């Protein structure tokens, strides 16, 4: 029975990821005053299926000097971790209701760095390695602020369980009392998922294609799936943290619809940002985090810790 539950979680995620690629190409197309994919199927709706078929029936090439086992393990690990992170997400009921769900999410997102590092190193190519090192530095850096922002938000809900956030936000979304945190969180999620304007790992102008430059066919598709699964997951996480939908135990479907619409709007904003902004310079990216975000988030974290103590109201404990 548990396997059926797992499949019922994974299959819709993969479908959502497939159609997100189409939505992205369509949105970017219309923003550049062109149509986007419109040949395969009505309005290009079958494009993701054609793409998947094309990628998975191609020959998976690999460089002669590459480390074979690690070269193959890296994309599999990337997708596995991307899908594992969906386990504690309440939609409105999680697959496994973990006591330390948020800690689990942080741990998994940190492990995802390894797949990028291994792929760059195992390719035995200088461009792939530089791309991987950039990605690792960027991901690790932005995880610092993500963790501090999470801590500040959790002080308002009083529990590491994600489901508690739904109850906390019954009357007020947490984006209102903590909007500076929400803004920094959103920008950090962009950097964490390697999206424009932070897609320095895939700097086409200088690094060809970043850490996955030597990948082709199936393994490349797995990296692609992992990236887009992470984008949707991060937006769902953002919705849970800051834009909690109203949950009626008798009508959980209403919650799911409300929740999905918010997550989709956030995902569309990711695409909109990609169409609108040029890429950051690497030193600017690091400067933004270490000199701007980190001091601000630390100050706000101190504020969120001291406020309840000052008002003699300890954080809610569940």
From Swiss-Prot:
- Name the reaction it catalyses: a ubiquinone + NADH + 5 H(+)(in) = a ubiquinol + NAD(+) + 4 H(+)(out)
Q: Which domain of life is it from?
A: Eukaryota
Q: Where are the transmembrane segments?
A: 2-22, 70-90, 100-120, 147-167, 171-191, 217-237, 253-273, 294-314
State a GO cellular component annotated for this protein: respiratory chain complex I
- Which PROSITE patterns does the UniProt record give? COMPLEX1_ND1_1 (PS00667), COMPLEX1_ND1_2 (PS00668)
What is the enzyme's main class? translocase
Q: Which InterPro entries match?
A: NADH_UbQ_OxRdtase_su1/FPO, NADH_UbQ_OxRdtase_su1_CS
This protein's membrane topology, according to the annotation, is:
Multi-pass membrane protein
Which UniProt keywords are present, listed alphabetically? Electron transport, Membrane, Mitochondrion, Mitochondrion inner membrane, NAD, Respiratory chain, Translocase, Transmembrane, Transmembrane helix, Transport, Ubiquinone
- One biological process term in Gene Ontology: mitochondrial electron transport, NADH to ubiquinone
| Pfam families for this protein | NADHdh (PF00146)
User: EC number(s) on record?
Assistant: 7.1.1.2
Give the Gene Ontology MF terms in alphabetical order: NADH dehydrogenase (ubiquinone) activity
Q: Where in the cell is it found?
A: Mitochondrion inner membrane
Family classification? Belongs to the complex I subunit 1 family.
User: Which proteins does it associate with, and in what oligomeric form?
Assistant: Core subunit of respiratory chain NADH dehydrogenase (Complex I) which is composed of 45 different subunits.
| PANTHER family on file | NADH DEHYDROGENASE SUBUNIT 1, NADH-UBIQUINONE OXIDOREDUCTASE CHAIN 1
Function comment = Core subunit of the mitochondrial membrane respiratory chain NADH dehydrogenase (Complex I) which catalyzes electron transfer from NADH through the respiratory chain, using ubiquinone as an electron acceptor. Essential for the catalytic activity and assembly of complex I.
Protein name from the UniProt record: NADH-ubiquinone oxidoreductase chain 1
**Classification lineage:** Eukaryota, Metazoa, Chordata, Craniata, Vertebrata
Q: What is the primary gene name for this protein?
A: MT-ND1
